[in-house]
C-alpha cells in the first residue's frame, strides 16, 4: 500500500516538521480567494467556498439542510483573516450536514477586515470597504449556525470545563475551541 502524503498547506507539516512554505521543497503556492470566486491559482482552491450565502438559500429552498440532530459548538477566538478563513472553510464543508454551530468572539468592534488595506482606509475612512465579508454574509448562514460577538475580549480558557470567559464575565461553553488571535508586535 502506498504511503499517504499529508495535505499540503503553507507552513510546517505537523508530523515531519518539514517546511512546505514557499520556497519550500514542494513549491506550494499561496492561495487567496476573492469574494467573487474568480481566483483559483491551484487545483486545491475551491471558488465555491466564497458563494456560501447562495448555497444556503438554494439548500433551504430544496429542503436539504439537516437540522434534525444535535450539533457540536465550535468557539473561534479571533475574528481576523485567519479566523474568518477558518469559519468560511468549516461552513463550506458543513453546510449540508449541519454538524457544527459556530460562535466567534472578536476583540475589535468591527467584523473581520483586511488589515493589509488599512492604508486605503485613511484615504476613504469607511471601514466597511475593508470587510472581508459584508455584514449580510454573517446573517445569511443557516439559522443558529453562526453567531459573533464583537468588542469582546476572551480573558480565560477553562479547558477542563470546556468554557471561555470574556471580559464582561460571560462564560461560553464549547465542544471545540479554535484560537485564531493573530499576533501583535
UniProtKB/Swiss-Prot annotation:
Homodimer. Binds 1 siroheme per subunit. Pathway: Nitrogen metabolism; nitrate reduction (assimilation). PANTHER family: NITRITE REDUCTASE (NADH) LARGE SUBUNIT. SUPFAM superfamilies: FAD/NAD(P)-binding domain. It is an enzyme of class 1 (oxidoreductase). FAD binds at residues 72-107. Pfam families: Pyr_redox_2 (PF07992). GO terms for biological process: nitrate assimilation. It comes from the Eukaryota. It catalyses: NH4(+) + 3 NADP(+) + 2 H2O = nitrite + 3 NADPH + 5 H(+); NH4(+) + 3 NAD(+) + 2 H2O = nitrite + 3 NADH + 5 H(+). Keywords: 2Fe-2S, FAD, Flavoprotein, Heme, Iron, Iron-sulfur, Metal-binding, NADP, Nitrate assimilation, Oxidoreductase. This is Nitrite reductase [NAD(P)H]. One of its GO terms (molecular function) is metal ion binding. Its EC number is 1.7.1.4. InterPro entries: FAD/NAD-bd_sf, FAD/NAD-binding_dom, NasD-like. Its cofactor is siroheme; [2Fe-2S] cluster; FAD. Residues 14-47 are annotated as: Disordered.
Amino acid at each position: 500500500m502506498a504511503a499517504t502524503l499529508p495535505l499540503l498547506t503553507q507552513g510546517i507539516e505537523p508530523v515531519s516538521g518539514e517546511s512546505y512554505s514557499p520556497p519550500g521543497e514542494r513549491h506550494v503556492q499561496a492561495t487567496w480567494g476573492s469574494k467573487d470566486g474568480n481566483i483559483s491559482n491551484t487545483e486545491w482552491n475551491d471558488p465555491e467556498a466564497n458563494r456560501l450565502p447562495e448555497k444556503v438559500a438554494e439548500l433551504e429552498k430544496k429542503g436539504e439542510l439537516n437540522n434534525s440532530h444535535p450539533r457540536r459548538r465550535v468557539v473561534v477566538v479571533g475574528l481576523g483573516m485567519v479566523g474568518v478563513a477558518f469559519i468560511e472553510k468549516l461552513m463550506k464543508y458543513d453546510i449540508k450536514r449541519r454538524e457544527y454551530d459556530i460562535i466567534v468572539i472578536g476583540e475589535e468592534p468591527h467584523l473581520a477586515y483586511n488589515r493589509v488595506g488599512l492604508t486605503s482606509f485613511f484615504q476613504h475612512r469607511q471601514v466597511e470597504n475593508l470587510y472581508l465579508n459584508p455584514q449580510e454574509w454573517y446573517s445569511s448562514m443557516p439559522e443558529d449556525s453562526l453567531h459573533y460577538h464583537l468588542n469582546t475580549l476572551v480573558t480565560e480558557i477553562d479547558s477542563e470545563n470546556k468554557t471561555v470567559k470574556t471580559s464582561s464575565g460571560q462564560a461560553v461553553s464549547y465542544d471545540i475551541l479554535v484560537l485564531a488571535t493573530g499576533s501583535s508586535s
